[in-house]
Amino acid sequence: MSGWPRIYYKLLNLPLSILVKSKSIPAEPAQELGLDTSRPIMYVLPYNSKADLLTLRAQCLAHDLPDPLEPLEIDGALLPRYVFIHGGPRVFTYYTPKEESVKLFHDYLDLHRSNPALDVQMVPVSVMFGRAPGREKGEDNPPLRMLNGVQKFFAISWLGRDSFVRFSPSVSLRRMADEHGTDKIIAQKLARVARMHFARQRLAAVGPRLPARQDLFNKLLASKVIARAVEDEARSKKISHEKAQQNAIALMEEIAANFSYEMIRLTDRILGFTWNRLYQGINVHNAERVRQLAHDGHEIVYVPCHRSHMDYLLLSYVLYHQGLVPPHIAAGINLNFWPAGPIFRRLGAFFIRRTFKGNKLYSTVFREYLGELFSRGYSVEYFVEGGRSRTGRLLDPKTGTLSMTIQAMLRGGTRPITLVPIYIGYEHVMEVGTYAKELRGATKEKESLPQMLKGLSKLRNLGQGYVNFGEPMPLMTYLNQHVPEWRESIDPIEAIRPAWLTPTVNSIAADLMVRINNAGAANAMNLCCTALLASRQRSLTREQLTEQLDCYLDLMRNVPYSTDSTVPAASAGELIAHALQMNKFEVEKDTIGDIIILPREQAVLMTYYRNNIAHMLIMPSLMAAIITQHRRISRDALQQHVEALYPMLKAELFLRWEREELASVIDALASEMQRQGLITLQDDELHINPAHSRTLQLLAAGARETLQRYAITFWLLSANPSINRSTLEKESRTVAQRLSVLHGINAPEFFDKAVFSSLVLTLRDEGYISDTGDAEPAETMKIYQMLADLITSDVRLTIESATQGE
């Protein structure tokens, strides 16, 4: 580029460099989209805009991509490196020819015909200044749509710092030429497909237009389902129809979001400023699969795990910066206090009560509102656990909202609904101290402005944050596979509850929990906490801690928990240095070296972070515990031990493997443990390697408390085979509390009611407990003897004496 065009672009770039601060989606386009910079790259933009072109250029130069203003020279021909699909509007409307883009596509394709070695990468790029969807009434032309020069100037002036450059996966023109030819008809088809691509991308970025809130309420009131519920309300409560209708409107006011793009923009600025000061980084993985779902027109339901109140803001912030529409979020009614409630409502929150029981009108209004969100095409987010995890483990799912999601499908008319499980991880959770108090029996504090300000005042260095998108679950595909007759239940008016609904919802919920855990994120804090809590004195030398982290990292890297889980790329030493900056540990120096200590008052709190990745290490920990206690064991015996205990572990930690997969998992982990020198293989027997016995013992300690808990319940069941489930749960907790006091077990979940409730249900499902009294006590005693061999003799004596003394 030379002469007047260079001067023109330089002059135009002066105001843009001041007004525009764009972000790239994805953050590293060359790496994440697999662009090969050694091969020719050309860019395709939706419509003619020099401002868009220069904004793209700034991002290309920042990410070491070819300059779009520098032409491509191929076989002596000079071609522009960018193509505008549409001429774009002007201040005065007139016909703008589209032939130029078709001609350029044809020129590029023709070069591929004459040069078989040529392969140009065509990269679609859209530049967005603002992403307001507009209202259903009022705005004819939301800012993202094609703007003429004057409109563009004002859009850039107002929205220049809320701009995104969205790179899409490249298209190989070589493949296009080989498969479809190089004539002008193919070039026209390519331009047409590109236009459709950009139209879909706009919808994915901004979402459908927003309704006026009152119009939405009027539509809901006019629905036959709510009209019938209003009549039932009037009849059952002996009130007038008008009063019952006012009750319905009041419930809509309580529930409904009041989405505001301006509030999104303002919050984005505040959160961007806040995250940069509180977090050292927010790590996002597998976002491209969600962008593709949005592009393909799926109705997306985000289903994250729930660690903290921060989840609401973090996930919306991440999605916005991934070029996706922030979802409508189901938030607990406890958050509907001033000023948080009105703010959350404008950020897309709709509020849900803890229980729907005894209020048919409320459940009907909520279900119809949720169905309306789906039918209008808004993405939705809800926490399937129902509340924040106090232990750091996934809670058993609450299936009410998920059931309503499937009922919305049974009304017909919605786009394909896809559930997206999300793992959210932190190196510091601001509520973790409160969680520990609640697990010890303290009453949960009601959310309020003073409590919120108190929490915010304590925010300091929060380390790293992690948002991992798991494997999506297309509901239609799932139902086609598991309930082929589901379409027979479609009813556009009534909320149907077919016989298959409850078991199917339970199965989907369990699958979602497994997929959330599959996307787990190991980090410096949870790895260091796992190692230090494994030590009985909660302290290790720096060398021992480094060796233990190396063991964990090698296990996770060489035998990954799943393809969606993430492990830090940093070394053990770097992770320890980072964890020490979080000020959770103490370092005691002596003449020999450093000792890293987890203080007693921090130990209970740090179990939360250990539990975040307990599922990722439980299998090697269990194997290490079995090998350590037996000193040597055959592969077959090891597998028998693991298979006997696996159903309880799978249910408690939502593990991913089926029973028939265990043999290959055990073999892979045993091979890795042998490679690390933790064990040796002699005559098909696994032996402890004395040189690395400490590392193996610390690895085994990860399963220690779980095995002790199982031993308690199996001993009680062995001692009293006719015990009922409720009593078994209660007595198991009592013994666990006694054990924790006598043996210094600092994990609050050790005697958590939910953990024992889940265990007892699994024992019933596995046949160890029977409501009809036909359980097999001999099998129960056999499992107890196996567990008794895996725990220390003093713990075993405490368990057995607890029942003997009663």
Curated annotation (Swiss-Prot):
Signal peptide: none annotated. A motif (HXXXXD motif) lies at residues 305-310. GO terms for cellular component: plasma membrane. It comes from the Bacteria. It is found in: Cell inner membrane. Pathway: Phospholipid metabolism; CDP-diacylglycerol biosynthesis; CDP-diacylglycerol from sn-glycerol 3-phosphate: step 1/3. SMART domains: PlsC (SM00563). It is a peripheral membrane protein. GO terms for biological process: CDP-diacylglycerol biosynthetic process; fatty acid metabolic process. Its EC number is 2.3.1.15. The keyword Cell membrane applies. It is an enzyme of class 2 (transferase). It catalyses: sn-glycerol 3-phosphate + an acyl-CoA = a 1-acyl-sn-glycero-3-phosphate + CoA. Keywords: Acyltransferase, Cell inner membrane, Cell membrane, Lipid biosynthesis, Lipid metabolism, Membrane, Phospholipid biosynthesis, Phospholipid metabolism, Transferase. GO terms for molecular function: glycerol-3-phosphate O-acyltransferase activity. InterPro entries: GPAT/DHAPAT, GPAT/DHAPAT_C, GPAT/DHAPAT_LPLAT, GPAT_PlsB, Plipid/glycerol_acylTrfase. It holds the Pfam family Acyltransferase. The HXXXXD motif is essential for acyltransferase activity and may constitute the binding site for the phosphate moiety of the glycerol-3-phosphate. Belongs to the GPAT/DAPAT family. This is Glycerol-3-phosphate acyltransferase. It comes from Salmonella schwarzengrund (strain CVM19633).
